[in-house]
Curated annotation (Swiss-Prot):
This is Large ribosomal subunit protein bL21. Part of the 50S ribosomal subunit. Contacts protein L20. The gene is rplU. This protein binds to 23S rRNA in the presence of protein L20. It comes from the Bacteria. It holds the Pfam family Ribosomal_L21p. The lineage of its organism: Bacteria, Bacillati, Actinomycetota, Actinomycetes, Mycobacteriales. GO terms for cellular component: cytoplasm; plasma membrane; ribonucleoprotein complex; ribosome. GO terms for molecular function: rRNA binding; structural constituent of ribosome. Keywords: Ribonucleoprotein, Ribosomal protein, RNA-binding, rRNA-binding. Belongs to the bacterial ribosomal protein bL21 family. GO terms for biological process: translation.
Length: 103
């Protein structure tokens, strides 16, 4: 069984292993920079670590591969009988990370 971790970033949690490429909420880091992510849980074979003191020593490191945008989300607000309608779109900014280590 492989080693993996659950990391928290941008208000979401992601399951990552070494070598994974994940898209997370935008981080204020440049391309090629190293980043460290807070860990919520670590699974190493049959050993599951959730203790806060033990997790304080664990670090998940990654490298920023670049920045991108998510899919377009269309918002349409409409009120009946008043002629009010509003169309809006949004594309979330994302950061592409490659996980380089769980230590």
């Amino acid at each position: 069984m492989a080693t993996y971790a659950i990391v928290k970033t941008g208000g979401k949690q992601y399951k990552v292993a070494v070598g994974d490429v994940v898209k997370v909420e935008k981080l204020e880091s440049e391309q090629g920079e190293k980043v460290s992510l807070p860990v919520a849980l670590v699974v190493d074979g049959a050993t599951v670590t959730t203790d806060a003191k033990a997790l304080a020593k664990v670090a998940v490191t990654g490298e920023v591969l670049g920045h991108t945008k998510g899919p377009k989300i269309r918002i349409h607000k409409f009120k009946n009988k008043t002629g009010y309608h509003k169309r809006q779109g949004h594309r979330q900014q994302l950061t592409v990370l490659k996980v380089t280590g769980i230590a």
